[in-house]
C-alpha cells in the first residue's frame, strides 16, 4: 500500500533528516513514498471442519481434445472449443452460435436411455455436434438466474450430478453418464446422474455456484436442493435430520357456523370412534407422505475427502414450502387436540376440587358461628350429618342385609 505524506508530515521529516527546501535532494524528491504493509494474520485453524473454505468454481477446464471456458459476469455463457472428430453433447435448444467450417458440422438429435431417465425426470433429448475440422461453439440456457461450472474428469474421481437439469453439456469419448436413483432420499431428489471416465462437464445451477472442499475427517450438512454435484468416495452421503427442524405457525381456523356445530348429527359423528380412527389414519398417511415423498426437511451429510458444488438459489419459495408443507405445519390431528384438552382439564381438576373444599369450609364455619343454640364445630356437625345419613341395612333381590352382620362376618373371615 502506498502512503503520501502531507505538508506537516513532510516538514517533520525534513527537520529530522536535516534536509532543507533548497537542497537538491528535496527538489529531486519533493514527495517521499512510504510502503506500509499490514502484519499477516494467522490463518484460521480448522477445528472439526468448522471453517471450511468456500470458493468460486474455476472458469475454464481443458483436456487434450476440448476446452470449456465460461464467459460473462456472472457466468452466463459457455464457450466450447472442439478439436477434429470430437463429439459435443448439449441439451436441446441451448446452442447459441458456432464458428468454423459450417459445412463440415454434423448435428443430430440423440435420445439417451429414455426409459430410465423419463421415470425420474432427467432430460434425455440431447443435441450431438461433431465436425472433422476444429470448431468453436457457444452454449447458454434460457433461464436468466443461472450460472455455469466446468469440471475436468481425469478418470481418478467419479462425480454425481444431483440435480436433474444441472447437466448442460459434456464431451469425451470415454465419458459415461448413467442415471441413478437414491431411494434414501425423497422422490423429488431421485434424479441423479453418475459420471465416470475422462472428459469435460458443463454444469448449470440457479444463482451462483460455489465449491466446498472437504478434507479427510471433515463433515458438511447441505440441503439436497442446493447440491449441484459432488465427488464419489468410499462413504456415500447419508440422509440427515436435525433434532428440531419444525416451524410452528399460528393460522386462524375456519369460521364454522354455530348452527352446524350445534347439530346433533355432527356432534354424534365427530364423537364416534369410527370418525376418530379415520381422521387419525388420514393424518398419519398425510404426515408420512409429506416426510417421505416431498421431504423438504431432509438433509445430506457428506464426509471428506470430497468436493461439493453448491448453488446459491436452491429452489423457489413454492418449491421450498408448498401448500402441502403449510398444511402439515398448520394441521393437527383432532384426536390429539381433544386429548390435550382432556389432559389439561384432568390436571386442573384437583386444584378446582381443593378450591371448592376451601370455599365449603369457610361457608360452613360462617353458618355454624351464626346458627342459634349451642356452639359446635364444623367437624362435629359433619359427624352428626354422617350419623344421620348412615345406612343400617340394604335390600337386594328381595332380601334384607344388615350392615352389622356384614361387618361381623368380615371379622370372622379375617380371624
From Swiss-Prot:
<keyword id="KW-0496">Mitochondrion</keyword>
<dbReference type="InterPro" id="IPR016031">
    <property type="entry name" value="Trp_RNA-bd_attenuator-like_dom"/>
</dbReference>
<comment type="similarity">
    <text>Belongs to the AIM24 family.</text>
</comment>
<dbReference type="Pfam" id="PF01987">
    <property type="entry name" value="AIM24"/>
</dbReference>
<dbReference type="InterPro" id="IPR036983">
    <property type="entry name" value="AIM24_sf"/>
</dbReference>
<protein>
    <recommendedName>
        <fullName>Altered inheritance of mitochondria protein 24, mitochondrial</fullName>
    </recommendedName>
</protein>
<feature type="transit peptide" description="Mitochondrion">
    <location>
        <begin position="1"/>
        <end position="33"/>
    </location>
</feature>
<dbReference type="GO" id="GO:0005743">
    <property type="term" value="C:mitochondrial inner membrane"/>
</dbReference>
<dbReference type="InterPro" id="IPR002838">
    <property type="entry name" value="AIM24"/>
</dbReference>
<keyword id="KW-0809">Transit peptide</keyword>
<dbReference type="GO" id="GO:0007007">
    <property type="term" value="P:inner mitochondrial membrane organization"/>
</dbReference>
Amino acid at each position: 500500500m502506498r502512503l503520501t505524506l502531507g505538508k506537516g508530515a513532510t516538514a517533520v521529516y525534513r527537520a529530522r533528516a536535516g534536509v532543507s527546501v533548497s537542497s537538491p535532494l528535496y527538489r529531486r524528491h519533493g514527495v517521499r513514498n512510504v510502503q506500509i504493509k499490514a502484519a499477516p494474520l494467522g490463518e484460521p485453524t480448522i477445528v472439526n471442519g468448522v471453517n471450511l473454505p468456500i470458493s468460486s468454481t474455476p472458469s475454464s477446464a481443458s483436456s487434450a481434445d476440448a476446452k470449456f471456458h465460461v464467459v460473462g459476469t456472472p457466468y452466463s455463457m459457455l464457450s466450447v472449443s472442439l478439436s477434429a472428430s470430437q463429439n459435443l453433447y448439449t441439451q436441446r435448444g441451448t446452442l447459441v452460435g458456432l464458428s468454423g467450417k459450417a459445412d463440415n458440422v454434423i448435428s443430430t438429435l440423440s435420445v439417451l436411455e429414455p426409459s430410465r431417465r423419463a421415470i425420474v425426470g432427467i432430460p434425455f433429448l440431447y443435441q450431438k455436434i461433431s465436425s472433422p475440422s476444429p470448431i468453436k461453439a457457444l452454449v447458454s440456457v434460457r433461464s436468466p438466474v443461472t450460472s455455469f461450472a466446468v469440471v475436468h474428469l481425469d478418470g481418478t474421481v467419479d462425480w454425481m450430478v444431483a440435480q436433474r437439469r444441472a447437466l448442460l453439456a459434456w464431451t469425451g469419448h470415454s465419458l459415461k453418464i448413467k442415471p441413478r436413483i437414491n431411494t434414501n432420499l425423497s422422490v423429488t431428489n431421485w434424479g441423479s446422474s453418475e459420471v465416470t471416465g475422462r472428459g469435460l462437464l458443463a454444469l448449470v445451477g440457479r444463482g451462483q455456484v460455489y465449491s466446498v472442499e472437504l478434507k479427510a475427517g471433515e463433515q458438511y450438512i447441505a440441503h439436497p436442493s442446493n447440491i449441484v454435484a459432488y465427488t464419489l468416495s468410499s462413504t456415500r452421503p447419508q440422509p440427515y435430520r436435525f433434532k428440531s427442524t419444525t416451524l410452528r405457525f399460528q393460522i386462524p381456523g375456519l369460521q364454522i357456523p354455530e348452527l352446524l356445530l350445534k347439530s346433533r348429527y355432527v356432534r354424534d359423528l365427530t364423537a364416534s370412534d369410527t370418525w376418530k380412527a379415520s381422521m387419525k389414519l388420514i393424518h398419519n398417511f398425510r404426515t408420512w407422505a409429506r416426510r417421505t415423498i416431498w421431504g423438504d426437511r431432509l438433509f445430506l451429510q457428506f464426509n471428506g475427502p470430497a468436493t461439493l458444488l453448491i448453488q446459491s438459489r436452491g429452489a423457489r419459495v413454492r418449491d421450498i414450502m408448498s401448500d402441502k408443507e403449510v398444511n402439515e405445519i398448520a394441521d393437527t390431528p383432532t384426536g390429539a387436540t381433544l386429548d390435550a384438552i382432556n389432559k389439561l382439564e384432568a390436571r386442573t381438576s384437583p386444584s378446582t376440587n381443593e378450591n371448592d373444599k376451601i370455599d365449603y369450609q369457610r361457608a360452613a364455619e360462617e353458618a355454624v358461628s351464626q346458627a342459634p343454640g349451642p356452639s359446635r364445630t364444623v367437624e362435629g356437625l359433619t359427624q352428626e350429618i354422617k350419623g344421620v345419613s348412615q345406612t343400617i341395612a340394604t335390600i337386594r333381590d328381595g332380601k334384607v342385609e344388615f350392615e352389622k352382620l356384614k361387618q361381623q362376618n368380615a371379622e370372622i373371615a379375617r380371624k
